[in-house]
């Protein structure tokens, strides 16, 4: 956003004019910024042509997803609602990955029927349920398993997901148990190892540590994975404009990893694609005086 003639604008359009026409509150998104973010991400990792699946959880607006789809991106979903939204936006099912810790039987069944690329499981019990459902449909499907690499993302504890005390993923012992189970299962094909260590990460070093942990795990098994899903978590700057994730160094670490392991990389960016493209615009309707300060009360609904 920029000020033009003392008016705050987005894409050179006055936010005041938009408010006058449509009322408030509303979300306003910059298409040029969205395009810039996507192209920058694709360019940064073009050396190995990853599958980029937009994390729908970061923005479920079907019109936004539809625009993102035009750049060739797939979708990462964590619920049947997000899956339906991705399909409605025109995302090819062969580019959709279904993640998340609490998939229901009906959600798994729906995902199988839609022939999406992968269902990333979070536990052995979930894999057994996926296998049961696939067997009932007489289908063989591709799945992934999320590994907890015990890697500190150096981010807020509330959004850290890759340490051993976090609820996400399975530990090493369970991971090897899952591999053995899948080898003896006719209806599931374990194709992907998935990791995701946290959100709002601005330092490339936790990613390097994560890749080393994954490499060590792969070296201890003869199972052939087709995909390594590195998740997302790439942060954006809110206050310190000089602190940005170094994509170049992350790319270098991945290339080093790929020299040892011949796999297809999947990314699940969300915030890094959409986070700085939109603005919530509201109107101040009241000013309330309290001790030592004043509160402005905007017209933003709570639902």
Segments predicted by a language model, with ranges:
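Glycine-rich tight-turn/loop motif centered on a GG-T
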Residues: 23-25, 113-118, 157-169, 203-205, ...
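Non-cysteine beta-strand/loop elements that form the S-adenosyl-L-methionine
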Residues: 78-81, 99-103, 142-156, 190-195, ...
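Conserved anion-binding
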Residues: 126-185
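C-terminal active-site-proximal or functional interface alpha/beta core segments in diverse enzymes
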Residues: 197-295
